[in-house]
Amino acid sequence: DRNTSGIVIAGKNSEALRQINEAVKLKSIKKYYKTLVCGKIEKSGRLEDFYEKDSQLNKAKVGGKEGKIITTIYRPLKTNGRYTLAEVELITGKSHQIRVHMASAGFPIIGDVKYGNKQENEYFRKKAGVKRQMLHAYKMVFEGLKGELAYLNGKTVTADVPKDFKCAEKEIFGI
């Protein structure tokens, strides 16, 4: 998603891109995100739902009876009872997946204008200058890669959260 910060993976040429796409499909590249959400997440969970996307409205929905199955795993890292810093692992990778899945589970992402809570977003805009969703691709783990990408096996790439994320985190947890 355009307003998500963090690691972006790209291929230098069409063959490298094909191999990356194949590796993602085979789960040889694992993607992890940090997010700040409304609500108290007490324990780890796994979300699995049918996913549909309306391309004209550029909006996704989950929980119907048809579409593609998507899977998202989440783990609470820290909570104050009202908000939670969570790690999210993408098992499937659809557009808006984390945002729509977390919102449907009752944990909308702070700053998400499409699936989030308007009042909470306004509060964080005023108090911490939040102008985008607090979703950050912070880690990629490479394992089981073949061919030209095999040199990445066993490697982990990480990216620190940006300043706006830290400001929102400070507002919540006083860090």
Predicted features, each with a name:
Residues 101-175:
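Pseudouridine synthases involved in rRNA/tRNA modification
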Residues 34-36, 139:
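Residues embedded in well-ordered beta-strands
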Residues 96-98:
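Short, well-structured beta-strand segments within conserved domains
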